[in-house]
């Protein structure tokens, strides 16, 4: 689980306005934070298949949000990909 302070920082960095918590940029940022936090767990616990299912679900949700953002506003998509260091 992401700590509250880290979560608030991710929201602040990706928000489009002061009270924005639901834009695709914020959602993708939070999912990326959760995914990055889980990666060390799967390096040491390779056979945690139930946990891996949750990870793959998060990755899929992030991909869908990125596809939505790309279809709505390609410039925001490109900026977010560059900021988070994700592949296209």
Curated annotation (Swiss-Prot):
GO function terms (MF aspect): rRNA binding; structural constituent of ribosome
InterPro entries with a match to the protein in the record: Ribosomal_uS15, Ribosomal_uS15_bac-type, uS15_NS1_RNA-bd_sf
Keywords noted in UniProt: Ribonucleoprotein, Ribosomal protein, RNA-binding, rRNA-binding
Pfam family, one: Ribosomal_S15
Top-level taxonomic group: Bacteria
GO biological process: translation
Alphabetical list of SMART domains matching this protein: Ribosomal_S15
Annotated TM spans: none
Listed GO CC annotations: cytosolic small ribosomal subunit
HAMAP family: Ribosomal_uS15_B (MF_01343_B)
Similarity comment text for this entry: Belongs to the universal ribosomal protein uS15 family.
Function comment: One of the primary rRNA binding proteins, it binds directly to 16S rRNA where it helps nucleate assembly of the platform of the 30S subunit by binding and bridging several RNA helices of the 16S rRNA.
Assembly and binders: Part of the 30S ribosomal subunit. Forms a bridge to the 50S subunit in the 70S ribosome, contacting the 23S rRNA.
Protein name, UniProt field: Small ribosomal subunit protein uS15
Native source species: Polaromonas naphthalenivorans (strain CJ2)
Classification of source organism: Bacteria, Pseudomonadati, Pseudomonadota, Betaproteobacteria, Burkholderiales
Gene from which the chain derives: rpsO
